[in-house]
């Protein structure tokens, strides 16, 4: 079971809402790592909003392991080819994910899921 899970409408306002939901992790996750998670959730939710369609929803799930953090963002959009992502495809979103995450990937189709993992940093809170 995820440590944090929530569902948002696939609308532009959900990008900020998703970042705000991560505030629940303050004290459990290192402050700098929480900032990285906010950036990563912004980029992945932005992609979902762009591709899922306004009538759809986005599911966000996060697991806090002893050594890693896993984030999944799922939508009902048309999917994509995870390893063929580049800046020329319309944005920096998955390029940023690739640079900041230890590992990442996705499952294309309906639903489409982007997942990523970070090495967990000790909390300083």
Where on the chain are the PLM-derived regions?
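Alpha-helix initiation/capping motif
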Residues: 7-11, 30, 85-87
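Conserved beta-strand-loop-beta-strand hairpin that lines the nucleotide-binding pocket
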Residues: 1-5, 48-125
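Short beta-to-alpha transition helix within the HATPase_c
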Residues: 1-20
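The cytosolic transmitter module of two-component sensor histidine kinases
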Residues: 11, 33, 37, 90-93
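Conserved short strand/loop->alpha-helix "switch" segment adjacent to the catalytic nucleotide/phosphoryl-transfer site
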Residues: 19-42
